[in-house]
Amino acid sequence: MRTFEGSFCGKDLKFAIVISRFNSFITDELLKGCLDGLKRHEVDSENIDVYYVPGAFEIPLVCKKLAKSKKYNAIIALGAVIRGSTPHFEYVSAEVSKGIANVSLEQEVPVIFGVLTCDTVDQAIERAGTKAGNKGFDAAMSALEMANLMKNISS
């Protein structure tokens, strides 16, 4: 039996990060964690491009444009959608997750879902670098592993 998995070495890999400005007090921390994860694993700063979008709903469109360019080994989507008192949360969360998955499948480029979908601000803060670690860092690890796995499958 042969098994295949991606490594966490980022040398010579290119990454795009698409980040929502909405809830920036959370997303800025996710970005810090993401950049830390990539740089700790030998990704050169010159191989990281960061694209800001207004809100989480806009993330899939920019991811699609970047994936179609074939310039990146993986794309990381970062955002924070926090439940309010209207059904808006459900609509945005569902469309963002579906949109990101569709881009990845259609373009055959890993698009990593680093969008927090939380019931409270406290939950989001916990996932952006306090009690529950930093999900931006976790997204970077997934991007590294998937970029290398896809590279291995292609060769």
Swiss-Prot record:
Belongs to the DMRL synthase family. It comes from Caldicellulosiruptor bescii (strain ATCC BAA-1888 / DSM 6725 / KCTC 15123 / Z-1320) (Anaerocellum thermophilum). InterPro entries: LS, LS/RS, LS/RS_sf. GO terms for biological process: riboflavin biosynthetic process. Keywords: Riboflavin biosynthesis, Transferase. It is an enzyme of class 2 (transferase). Pathway: Cofactor biosynthesis; riboflavin biosynthesis; riboflavin from 2-hydroxy-3-oxobutyl phosphate and 5-amino-6-(D-ribitylamino)uracil: step 1/2. The keyword Transferase applies. Catalyzes the formation of 6,7-dimethyl-8-ribityllumazine by condensation of 5-amino-6-(D-ribitylamino)uracil with 3,4-dihydroxy-2-butanone 4-phosphate. This is the penultimate step in the biosynthesis of riboflavin. The active site is at residue 88. HAMAP family: Lumazine_synth. Its EC number is 2.5.1.78. The gene is ribH. Pfam families: DMRL_synthase. It catalyses: (2S)-2-hydroxy-3-oxobutyl phosphate + 5-amino-6-(D-ribitylamino)uracil = 6,7-dimethyl-8-(1-D-ribityl)lumazine + phosphate + 2 H2O + H(+). GO terms for molecular function: 6,7-dimethyl-8-ribityllumazine synthase activity. This is 6,7-dimethyl-8-ribityllumazine synthase. Signal peptide: none annotated. (2S)-2-hydroxy-3-oxobutyl phosphate binds at residues 85-86, 127. 5-amino-6-(D-ribitylamino)uracil binds at residues 22, 56-58, 80-82, 113. GO terms for cellular component: cytosol; riboflavin synthase complex.
